[in-house]
Swiss-Prot record:
InterPro entries: EF-Tu_GTP-bd, EF-Tu_GTPase, EFTu-like_2, EFTU_2, G_TR_CS, P-loop_NTPase, Small_GTP-bd, T_Tr_GTP-bd_dom. It comes from Chloroflexus aurantiacus. Keywords: Cytoplasm, Elongation factor, GTP-binding, Hydrolase, Magnesium, Metal-binding, Nucleotide-binding, Protein biosynthesis. GTP binds at residues 1-7, 62-66, 117-120. Mg(2+) binds at T7. It is found in: Cytoplasm. HAMAP family: EF_Tu_B. Gene3D superfamilies: P-loop containing nucleotide triphosphate hydrolases (3.40.50.300), Translation factors (2.40.30.10). This is Elongation factor Tu. One of its GO terms (molecular function) is GTP binding.
């Protein structure tokens, strides 16, 4: 929630970790004056900091404004493997706290650790217990394991303002406890390269005498010559299976391509007309084509280059999914008349053609090539 101390905590973490030589200290105003970035056509003020514990290296993001947080979570500008929920003890959970927990659930943040801030302002230990209880209930209500989530108590400002260079100074204890909780409780994510193969197809070429080559950047997993793969999406037909007979990168032949590589894959028995941009090449059965899904969507304000007017159920924009635009119709929840620019809503979307989709997939909503919103798939409906 605004003023609960997210930015103070971020600065305090970099300070304490810098005493261990495991981070570069970043002052409050450096974080607060966050640079703007673009993600899926949306501008977001976002500050990245990094630090190292004994166990892991962390990339941590902080956003100055509430709207920036929402945009960051929905666009997935920063991939989140976990989150620190900062709550001011004297204030307790506030409406934005609920919204953040709900969004974290919707966009599939795997784990949350809580930092209960400003506890020095609480004289009554029973009140502190109540705030903690309320938080655990709130987390459970939105599908997180409220009973087992670590809640670390402390005062970020005291850690930030302390003159001490001794990492064992009492005012730093809460920050070290928090880092320990993050290390122990937030699971290590599976690396992209260890997940099933998937490459969004960006381009298709016919090569005389050799067959059809599809190019793109491998999103996850790996591919090697001889692998059986599927071509999924952009058609009502079942996915086609084929065999990769060559993998190339910058005109060089490779044994295999891995997540992050830009490659060309030569496909056996596939005509130039059988494949198109917007389809994906993937490990068989690893992703299915769908038309209908539920999504959490942020609609751009007019000042952000979005629409100037609301839209209603039945609105048919383009959905930019991975590499291409697909037309679809929007359905609003019961009782919701319309969506205003700047709103953050759950909606159902039905595309005119099935596309390779899974929960957690990010997309942009466009109108005549201009981004008017961003969303994340929260539930497949067909």
């Amino acid at each position: 929630h605004v003023d609960h101390g997210k930015t103070t905590l971020t600065a305090a973490i970099t300070k304490v970790m810098s005493l261990k030589g495991a981070a570069q200290f970043m002052a409050y105003d450096q974080i607060d004056n966050a640079p703007e970035e673009r993600a899926r056509g949306i501008t977001i003020a976002i500050r990245h900091v990094e630090y190292q514990t004994d166990k892991r290296h962390y990339a941590h993001v902080d956003c100055p404004g509430h709207a920036d947080y929402i945009k960051n979570m929905i666009t997935g500008a920063a991939q989140m493997d976990g989150a620190i929920l900062v709550v001011s003890a004297p204030d307790g959970p506030m409406p934005q706290t609920r919204e953040h927990i709900l969004l974290a659930r919707q966009v599939q943040v795997p784990a949350i650790v809580v930092f209960l801030n400003k506890v020095d302002m609480m004289d009554d230990p029973e009140l502190l217990e109540l705030v903690e209880l309320e938080l655990r209930e709130l987390l459970s209500k939105y599908g997180f394991p409220g009973d087992e989530i670590p809640i670390v108590r402390g005062t970020a400002r005291n850690a930030l303002e302390s003159p001490s260079k001794d990492i064992n100074a009492p005012e730093y204890k809460c920050i070290l406890e928090l880092m320990n909780a993050v290390d122990e409780y937030i699971p290590t994510p599976q690396r992209a390269v260890d997940q099933p193969f998937l490459m969004p197809i960006e381009d298709v070429f016919g090569i005389k005498g050799r067959g059809t080559v599809v190019t793109g950047r491998i999103e996850r997993g790996k591919v090697k010559v001889g692998d059986t793969v599927e071509i999924v999406g952009m058609t009502n037909d079942a996915p086609r299976r084929t065999v990769v007979t060559g993998v190339e990168m910058f005109q060089k032949t490779l044994d295999e391509g891995i997540a992050g590589d830009n490659v060309g894959c030569l496909l056996r028995g596939i005509e130039r007309t059988d494949v198109e941009r917007g389809q994906v090449l993937c490990a068989p059965g690893s992703i299915k084509p769908h038309k209908k899904f539920e999504a959490q969507v942020y609609v751009l304000k007019k000042e952000e280059g979005g629409r100037h007017t609301p839209f209603f159920s039945g609105y048919r924009p383009q959905f930019y999914i991975r590499t291409t635009d697909v037309t679809g119709a929007i359905g609003l929840p019961a009782g919701m008349e319309m969506v205003m620019p700047g709103d953050n809503v759950v909606m159902t979307i039905e595309l005119i053609v099935p596309v390779a989709i899974e929960e957690g997939l990010r997309f942009a909503i466009r109108e005549g090539g201009r981004t008017v919103g961003a969303g994340v798939v929260t539930k497949i409906l067909d």
